[in-house]
Regions:
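PRPP-associated nucleotide enzymes
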Residues: 1-138, 143-238
Length: 238
């Protein structure tokens, strides 16, 4: 099969194509009929909680590390993962980044409830944040920006840090709370840092449409039409 092309027309990186198939093989990205928290009826659903094995977590960290390096380079010191799903994401990505790029980075996460005893009491766990630290935030998927609204004040209150950006695994490419642009663009406008993703839903469709994963076509023409209809209703209008 010829190399897939990105929406911009350039060849899609191999790790992105692998990650898309990896999500399907790990039962993380599903297609069918789903009702989202927002109430929207969606033909696809992503559950990062389905990454449960050592192999899956190892590979997941590598995909995040590749995407972070592509989008932010080595100009960061800390990976911050908002509780709860962001905690293992920040840990496995820190390990993978060291293995792949030889750079030692620290991990940090927030607590849903502050710890009021012991040496590590407070709102954060993992590494301490220091003035001047450059932080990349790590999440599974951003649909509303709610978790960033909760964790951003904790991070900036801990030290005078620079948020280099946020990385998520999948850009759903749907309108956010404002109903005009994506949740990722809303976060960028509100906080002033870039939001990147390993892959976008457009890239997912491009790779999976009429192609097999584990001997089965994942997105056939009928499902493709349903996805197109979903984005006609909820997608961002260019």
């Amino acid at each position: 099969m010829a190399a897939a092309a990105s929406p911009e027309g350039s060849p899609m990186e191999a790790y992105k194509q692998e990650f898309i198939k990896f999500m399907v093989e790990s039962n993380v990205l599903k297609f069918g009929d789903f009702t989202l928290k927002s109430g929207r009826k969606s033909p696809f659903f992503m559950n990062a909680g389905a990454y449960v094995t050592g192999y899956q977590l190892k590979k997941l960290g590598e995909y995040y590390a590749h995407a972070i390096h592509d989008n932010f380079g080595d100009d960061f010191d800390v990976l911050f993962g908002p509780a709860y799903k962001g905690i293992p994401l920040s840990v496995v990505t820190a390990i993978a980044y060291h293995d792949l790029y030889g750079k030692e980075v620290r991990y940090c996460s927030d607590r849903k409830e502050a710890k009021d005893h012991g040496a590590d009491k407070g709102n954060l766990l993992g590494a301490e944040l220091h003035d001047g630290d450059r932080v990349v935030m790590v999440e599974d998927v951003t649909t509303s920006g709610k978790s960033i609204d909760e964790t951003y004040p904790k991070v900036t209150a801990a030290a005078n840090v620079e948020i280099r950006g946020l990385i998520v695994s999948l850009n759903r490419m749907e309108v956010g709370k404002g109903g005009v642009t994506t949740a990722q663009k809303e976060i960028e406008a509100k906080y002033g840092f870039p939001v990147a993703s390993i892959v976008s839903m457009a890239e997912v469709v491009e790779v999976l449409h009429n192609h097999e994963v584990e001997g089965k076509v994942v997105i056939d023409d009928e499902l493709k039409a349903r996805i197109d209809a979903y984005y006609e209703q909820y997608g961002v209008k260019e």
